[in-house]
Design a protein with these regions (language model features):
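C-terminal helical cap(s) of enzyme catalytic domains, especially alpha/beta-barrels
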Residues: 109-129
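Conserved alpha/beta-domain cores
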Residues: 1-105, 109-111, 123
Length: 129
């Protein structure tokens, strides 16, 4: 929520309403960031109170399993949160469900994603220097 507040402050300073996606840590992995699903209501209310923030949807990542089918329940829960989020905002405002990366985007799409992040599939693995 502190990040939302900072974005709101900076957007307000330049007279902008910033579109954002709320990131949820559905899998509960310690290596992932994001809002825990049990903090959903608190996060939604905090976002709605910020005048320079426009929530457009949510994003989440599944753990990397050896068996891709194990990602399906995570993406399914992401879709459920997305539908719940849609009910909290004006009709049409929540329109992005970003789930799935280069290795698991097919299952994410099957489970309702309408935005995927496939940079590695397009550009290759990152080279860290």
């Amino acid at each position: 929520i502190s990040i939302l507040q900072e974005i709101d402050k900076r957007a307000g300073q330049i007279g902008k309403v910033q579109d954002v996606l709320l990131e949820f840590n559905i899998s509960g992995e310690e290596t992932k960031t994001g809002i825990e699903p049990d903090a959903f209501e608190e996060a939604v209310e905090a976002a709605k109170a910020l005048p320079n923030i426009r929530v457009c949807g949510l994003m989440c990542m599944a753990p990397q399993f050896g068996d891709l089918e194990k990602t399906r329940p995570v993406f399914r829960e992401g879709h459920e949160l997305y539908k719940k989020l849609q009910k909290k905002f004006p009709e049409g405002q929540i329109h992005i469900l970003s789930m799935g990366m280069s290795h698991d985007f097919e299952i994410a799409i099957e489970e309702g994603a309408n935005m995927v992040r496939i940079g590695t599939a397009i550009f290759g693995a990152r080279v860290y220097r």
